[in-house]
Amino acid sequence: MRYTFGIVTVYLLAGCAGSPPKPPEVKGKYRPINRVEAPASAGRNPVNSLNALCGNLNEKQCR
């Protein structure tokens, strides 16, 4: 009981020291460098796009 305050203080300080720093602020225009391009197979056909999104579901379940 005598050392409770000291132990709690040490745990709090160690927890704050182990936390990661804040990421840097974005200045200017944000451009992601590792962007994954979308597959062109779906194209502009809404039926193909719908099937690509729904996977194995039939059309009534998806809509």
Swiss-Prot record:
Signal peptide positions (record): 1-15
Protein name in UniProt: Putative conjugal transfer lipoprotein XF_a0011.1
Domain of life: Bacteria
GO CC, alphabetical: plasma membrane
Family, similarity comment: To B.suis ORF12 in VirB region.
Keyword NADP tagged: no
Source organism of this protein record: Xylella fastidiosa (strain 9a5c)
Lipidation, N-palmitoyl cysteine type: 16
